[in-house]
Design a protein with these regions (language model features):
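PLP-dependent aminotransferase-like
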Residues: 91-148, 168
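Active-site phosphate-binding strand-loop segment of PLP-dependent enzymes
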Residues: 126-191
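Short acidic capping loops at alpha-helix termini that bridge into adjacent secondary structure
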Residues: 71-75, 95-98, 198-199
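Conserved glycine-rich beta-strand-loop-beta hairpin in the small C-terminal domain of fold type I
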Residues: 251, 266-276, 286-298, 324-327
Length: 354
């Protein structure tokens, strides 16, 4: 692998949107399953092309408030979860403020901190889990903490006990806890826990649960009313309202039967088992994902492997260094079982040198 080839592995953006009949992409974390059928009934009669309320469509805010047990006024609809996190940072941070991230992290987190003049600092996960002793030391002096569970890229679910400890620490220290729970409905083992409190902001999305990534509908909620007002003020000048059409489709998605989520979860579980067992059989060192749809195996020479798999075998994987860890790669199993099996076979061929 030449220096020029090494330099071509610039980041996930080089792979996002690539497709082809012979390409197997374990890259993007975008569900390939369909959204709820009822969301499409919005389209034929949609006529609302004017600006909408900055904070969101009232009926969508009310539906989400009912689900999360907060007042509607404490919900803000955003352009995906990414905007929700960006708004949190732009509202909270002054130049030089430190934000604690768990490592490995979702690749966008450090850059979002830096764009908003903050300084990312880290606490290392142990096999995907928060080490409370290390966390306790690392959180001192921070303005905010960002925790993601179920995790991307780890697939790990933090325990209620751990998250309640994190919640208490942050509220006691008056450090804002931004809790990214976009995969909360994709849990195979363990239990989801949503932290709460004056210094907690919960972030969620319709992208993963309802397979609506391209519509860009996320939201945040918090018990802190003053913080919510400051968020809305920031959004007023940054992006105004989230797409009205997308919000109407999101509102319909909330009416989908519970079987929609449980059916999708079983599909994800089967795919998880397929790729996890397949990688184990190939000799990889990895833990079993408890949620989301990623595996994060340890590999030797990950840059060479990612490049060769792409150029020689037409298999896309993501470098672990994009997520803060240099000796691993990330594979998403957001693709059908046949493609997972074909991708595993190509990885086997790569490992055998054929």
């Amino acid at each position: 692998m030449s220096r020029g080839e090494v330099n071509q592995l610039t980041g996930p953006s080089m792979f996002i949107g690539l497709n082809g009949d012979d390409l197997i992409s374990f890259g993007s974390g975008q569900p390939d399953l369909p959204p709820p059928e009822n969301v499409f009934k919005v389209l034929p009669n949609f006529t609302s092309f004017k600006y909408g309320p900055i904070q969101g469509q009232r009926h969508l805010m009310e539906a989400l408030a009912l689900e999360h047990h907060v007042p509607p006024e404490n919900v803000v609809i955003t352009n995906g979860a990414s905007e929700a996190i960006d708004l949190c940072f732009s509202t909270l941070l002054k130049p030089g403020d430190m934000v604690l991230l768990t490592k490995p992290y979702y690749y966008a987190y450090p850059r979002l901190v830096e764009i908003n003049k903050g300084v990312p600092t880290y606490t290392r996960l142990v096999k995907g889990k928060i080490d409370l002793d290390d966390f306790r030391k690392a959180v001192e002096g921070c303005k905010a903490v960002l925790v993601n569970s179920p995790g991307n890229p780890t697939g790990s679910v933090q325990s209620p006990k751990t998250l309640s400890e994190v919640e208490k620490m942050c509220n006691d220290l008056k450090v804002y806890l931004i809790f990214d729970e976009v995969y909360c409905n994709l849990i195979y083992e363990g239990e989801h826990y949503s932290p709460r409190g004056e210094y907690v902001v919960n972030v969620n999305s319709f992208s993963k649960t309802f397979a609506m990534c391209g519509l860009r509908v996320g939201y945040l909620y918090s018990e802190n009313e003053e913080f919510i007002k400051a968020i809305v003020d920031q959004k007023t000048y940054k992006s105004m309202n989230t797409s009205i059409l997308s919000q109407e489709m999101a509102f319909e998605a909330l009416k989908a039967p519970k079987s929609f989520i449980t059916h999708h979860l079983e599909v994800w579980r089967k795919r998880r088992d397929l790729i996890y067992n397949g990688l184990l059989d190939l000799g990889f060192d990895l833990w079993k994902p408890e949620g989301a749809f990623y595996v994060f195996p340890r590999v030797d020479n990950p840059r060479k492997m990612v490049w060769d798999l792409y150029k020689r075998y037409k298999v896309i994987t993501y470098l672990g260094e994009w997520f803060g860890v240099e000796d691993r790669i990330r594979l998403s199993y957001a693709l059908d079982a046949r493609k997972i099996e074909e991708g595993l076979e190509r990885i086997r061929e790569y490992l055998s040198g054929s």
